[in-house]
Amino acid sequence: MEKKVIKKKRKKQEKRKKFRKFWKLGIEEFNTQYFSISRDHELVVREGNYQYNIFDLVQKFGSPLEVAFPFIVEKRYLDLVQTFNYHIKDYGYKGRFFYHYPMKVNQNKEVVLPLISEGANLETGSYNELWLVRKLWEQDQFDSRIRVICNGPKTDRYLGLVQELKEKGLSIIPIIEDLNEYEALKKYRGDVGVRVKLDLRVKSRWDKKNDRYGLSADDIYELGRIKNLKLLHYHIGSQTMHKDDIVAAVKKAIGIYIKIKKSNPSLDTLDIGGGLAIPYEKKKHYNPSSVVKSIISVLKKTCDKEGISHPNIICEWGRYMVAPAQITIFKILCEKPIDHGIAKNWYIIDGSFMNDLIDTWAIHQKWHIVPVNNLRNEKLTRVWLAGSSCDSDDRYTAGGSYILLPRLEDLDSSEYQYIALFDSGAYQDSLASHHCLLSSPAKIIAQNGVLTVARRRESPEEVGKMFGW
């Protein structure tokens, strides 16, 4: 009898494992290591010994719903710092590593404060973002050692705030991005950085033939000595798909760095910008540790050969840091047949791709989509998803492929199917809109076993007020 019970238990475990594998859950390489399937066939998220049942959350808070997990951000930050420091020590590299979180990726409090609390530095791209830094600084929410880099067009207000914070004791470095900014910062008494255009084509979401950011290497050489130059910065793109492109950029940048340092001995830091990709589609991808290892190796070998001291390293990998720390939940309202197409039906969701996940429309972003309930249903159907706005572009077709989801005909009459879209923590919140006056999703934060409402569901009156009604 006992053997039968054990055998039955093993069968259940094997079946659960099979479905986890099918939905690509519990896999660190895909950033789904915290996600699993409950005994009731529902999506769960595990934070140590805490567990969040996503189906229960959507029953309690309704849909559409965003669920943010600050603990994932904290863990990713600590892992990245540990990875850099490990390879720095392993190679005998003499420079230090600093992570600067680019606030534009996600300015929400539940993201920024956990990163700061773990020791992350910041990068701002506008006066308003730096104003928020000032507010936190005045509230004594910063360690005095925090460092801030300022990118973006430097308006007079922006530069004035940089000067004010520098005088108050904040370690702050404005980045020169054009010759006008070079002139404007001549009287600035603090450290400065300069952004270089690498003139390097890579496969990424942001690889443009004409780059409007930064100065050419020749322009920087012609400037000669730049007062208090501390940092050389570049940015090759977003979602850089090949490791070799990241390494090629480092090789080119360190060559430029060495030339500039000859006339600027104060230069001691290389900021490699952002661009580290994440596996949105949950396919095999380069390993971040191998990227870091190659970066350290290239910098050390090149500097040792040229007799130059190893520069400190800054990276601004924002999407990599925060995208996996949020999921977006929708309810399937109904289905409609597709007459001609690889998918069989449209599933109509109770939210909007154009409003809530705008990269679906803007850059044809692909998402990993998993059922919230009925995760062990073996009968699945090929579908496309349509948003609730009246716009024909409000849809998701997986790049011309299809999404596999449970069949609605198999549900109980009173049951709804819910779906989770992974990796929605980068850019989507700040770019969101209210097309067709649709309300934004409600948002909750799950941390340390506690649920906090970060944004309650908007009423029609509240949405109308945004448009003057």
What are these regions (language model features)?
Residues E2-D156, G400-F422, A426-D429, H434-C436, ...:
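N-terminal capping/small domains of soluble enzymes
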